[in-house]
């Protein structure tokens, strides 16, 4: 018989929207992702929008992992 030991893990998510035109006011997909995460009991620690530039995206993902253990790029 196998015994499983599980412990709860707190998940803190970062939501990164990639767009050169969207703003926090009109980013409906980012807002929907945050809403779904919060409904699932997952806190959103970071929400940001970055330009569609690979270096900016990479920098934001790496920075986000300093304070969040889940990063969603949208």
Model-derived features: where do they sit?
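Non-catalytic beta/alpha edge segments that cap or flank active sites
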Residues: 1-74
């Amino acid at each position: 018989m196998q015994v499983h030991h599980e412990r709860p893990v707190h998940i803190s998510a970062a939501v990164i929207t990639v767009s050169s035109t969207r703003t926090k006011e009109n980013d409906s997909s980012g807002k929907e992702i945050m809403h779904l995460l919060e409904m699932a009991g997952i806190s959103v620690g970071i929400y940001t929008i970055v330009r569609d530039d690979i270096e900016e995206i990479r920098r934001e993902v790496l920075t986000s992992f300093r304070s969040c253990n889940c990063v969603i790029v949208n």
